[in-house]
Structure formats: C-alpha cells, structure tokens
C-alpha cells in the first residue's frame, strides 16, 4: 500500500536574475523519497526542492559566499489507486493504509566561483504507517540518505542576469537505515519485524542524482523549470520480512530511481517589498525500471507518479528567503512494476491529496570578496 517513498536529497536550486523562487518540494523532491519520499505516501519519493532563480536582494551568490537552508515536507497519504483508478472501497470499508511523513532537510551551499558551487544535504525523517482497521502503528525516525552535489551555470552569471541554466551532478550516500525494525504484538504473539519500505529512512544503496534549474525573466515575472533524477547503482535492498517470502520476486525491497519536475511563474507583489507569489505544475514519482543496468528490476517497489498544481508565496529580506507552497494532486497513477507484469498482477498504492512544503535560506557573505565579485553580486540583485 502506498506509493513512492520520499526523496530527501534532491534540491533544485537556481540563483539568478530578479526573483529567487526558493521553495519547492524538498527534492526531498523533486519528489522526495528520503530515498523514497517523492511521490506520495507509499510510493516513496522524498524531496524538498527549490523553484525559480535568484532573489531580488541577494542575486547570484558571489565567490566565497555561503547559503544555509532548512526544508520541510509533510504529507498524509491514504487515497488508494490501482493505475489511475481510485479504490474508493478502501476508505468506505475502513481498510485504507495511512502514511504520515515529516521530512526535514538541512543543507549548505558554498560558491566556489561565479559559476560553480557545491551543496551538502542531510535529511531527517519521522514517519508512521497504520492500517485503519488495525491497532498496530509502525514508526520510524532517523537520518536519511545524505547527498553532495556540484553545480554550475552554463552562462557566466556576470553576463546573464535575465536568464540562465544550472546543471548539477552528485552522489547520494547510503547514510540512512533501510532495515528499521518495530516490535509489535498481535494475537498475543510478540515479534520484531521490518517496517514498510515507504517509511524506511534510507534506501540502502549509492545513488547518482543529477538536476537542472532554468529561469527566464520577462517583464516583472520570472518563469522557471527545475528537475531532478536520481539513478541508483544497486538493484535490491533489505529483506521485507524475517522469514523467506514465498513470492521470490519481491522478497527484497527494490532500490529505486526517483524523479521530480516542476515549472511555473513567479510574480512579485509591487505593494509589498520582497513578497512574491508562485504557481505552476509539479510531477514526481518512481519508475518501474531503473536507468542503470545493475539488475533485473525485480524486488518490491510501488512505481507510479503524481501530478499536482502548486501555488505558494515567498518572502525575501536582507538575504533571507522564506517560501511556503502547497501541492494539490490532480492526477495519480500507480503503474505496474516488473514483478506485476511477470505475475499478471497490478498492485495498489496510497497517495496524498496535499503535500505541504516550506523552505528557509539565509546567506553568509565572504568578507574578503574581491571588487569584481562585489560588482557581480550588486549587478545580479538589480532588476533587468
């Protein structure tokens, strides 16, 4: 039950021109599973991302500058789907699975030069899983899979203040546990069992995240398009139960790729300095097959995706940026996994109706910034 997991490592970052649309999914995404939190509930894709380009007061980061941030993502998934068809009978009979996920991301970016930067991200997950007609509640908490990414602007920010594209490549490190166990009591019998993979803090494998961020200023608006895809270098993770599962294709959890795409427009409110409204579509999910040929795409996974509309606001002041968005799902699809296809089945997954996202960043400027970089930072903060 349940869809993807939740990406925790992915942050879509773009700093430039006039507006910094810094919010996003957290990313973990971008969709996004701490290894699996992106999508919705059980699917596992976790992300707190950023949207847009640089803000009107900070502009591009100057060489030697630091930016620190905290991202937050909350979702409550309980709406079951098989394919794109909602399974209404689950809530009517009270058999729905309810996943509650709270994901925080702590990250820091260091600007190496005018074009290049590095970012380190550490996620923290707190989650619970409960079948409505059962008294047993499964829980997990801990550090998720951390990441380190290098990012670079295609064009020199000192020359391109009205639009640019940033590309990033990094490593997702298996710092989160993928075998969290709970001790439960059922029918007078006490046992210790692994929790469902949708609330495991880690995936148990090394990943290669790559991302892009693009923005273009037009009049007083900024249009943005951000995305992230994480390729996993491992096929199978932890065993799903303490005993051998007779269904050999799914006795282990799959270590899944995950992705996030989002775009939209940011419009400043002229009467309130530093306030910007955001709106655009968002898509995040987990594919049925991984990109890298490291296995047979077996193991247990809940592939699928969710498409949402995401309105939000952002407030910028003195290099501090606070963003809040709410993603409302308008289309959800639990696609078939490779074991589903081989056995003729089609599993279900629980999705969220709403995903709540918040992000706060602040900057620490390098005191010994050169005259050239000072001019660069000042120019980037001006409207075109």
Place the predicted regions along the sequence by residue.
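Cleavable N-terminal export/targeting peptides
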Residues: 1-49, 365-384
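Outer-membrane pore/translocation modules
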Residues: 126-254
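Residues on the lipid-exposed face of transmembrane beta-strands in outer-membrane beta-barrel proteins
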Residues: 56-59, 70-72, 106-110, 120, ...
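Short loop/turn motifs that connect adjacent beta-strands in outer-membrane beta-barrel proteins
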Residues: 40-43, 56-65, 77-79, 115, ...
């Amino acid at each position: 039950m349940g869809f993807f997991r939740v990406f925790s490592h992915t942050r879509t970052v773009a700093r430039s021109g006039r507006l910094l649309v810094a919010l996003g999914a957290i990313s973990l995404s971008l969709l996004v599973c701490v290894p699996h939190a992106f999508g919705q509930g059980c699917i596992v894709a976790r992300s707190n991302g950023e949207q847009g380009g640089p803000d009107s007061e900070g502009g591009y980061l100057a060489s030697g500058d630091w930016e620190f941030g905290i991202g937050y993502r909350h979702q409550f998934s309980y709406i079951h789907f098989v394919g794109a068809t909602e399974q209404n009978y689950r809530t009517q009979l009270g058999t729905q699975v309810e996943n509650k996920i709270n994901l925080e991301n702590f990250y820091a970016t260091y600007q190496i030069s005018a074009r290049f930067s590095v970012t380190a991200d550490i996620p923290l997950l707190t989650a619970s899983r409960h079948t409505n007609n059962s008294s047993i509640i499964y829980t997990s908490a801990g550090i998720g899979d951390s990441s380190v990414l290098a990012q670079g602007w295609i064009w020199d920010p000192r020359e391109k203040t009205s639009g640019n594209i940033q590309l990033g490549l990094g490593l997702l490190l298996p710092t989160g546990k993928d075998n969290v166990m709970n001790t439960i009591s059922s029918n007078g019998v006490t046992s210790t069992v692994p929790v469902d993979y949708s609330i495991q803090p880690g995936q148990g494998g090394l990943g290669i995240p790559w991302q892009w961020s693009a923005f273009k200023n037009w009049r007083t608006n900024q249009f943005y398009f951000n995305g992230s895809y994480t390729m996993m270098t491992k096929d199978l993770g932890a065993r799903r139960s303490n005993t051998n599962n007779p269904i050999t294709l799914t006795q282990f959890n799959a270590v899944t790729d995950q992705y996030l795409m989002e775009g939209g427009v940011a419009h400043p409110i002229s009467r309130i300095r530093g306030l910007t409204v955001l709106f655009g579509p968002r898509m995040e999910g987990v594919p049925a097959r991984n990109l890298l040929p490291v296995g047979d795409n077996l193991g247990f996974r809940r592939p699928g995706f969710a498409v949402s509309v995401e309105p939000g606001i952002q407030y910028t002041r003195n290099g501090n940026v606070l963003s809040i968005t709410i993603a409302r799902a308008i289309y959800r699809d639990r696609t078939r996994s490779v074991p589903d296809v081989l056995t003729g089945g089609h599993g279900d997954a629980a999705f969220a109706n709403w995903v709540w996202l918040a992000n706060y960043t602040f900057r620490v400027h390098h005191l010994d910034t050169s005259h050239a970089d000072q001019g660069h930072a000042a120019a980037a903060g001006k409207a075109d």
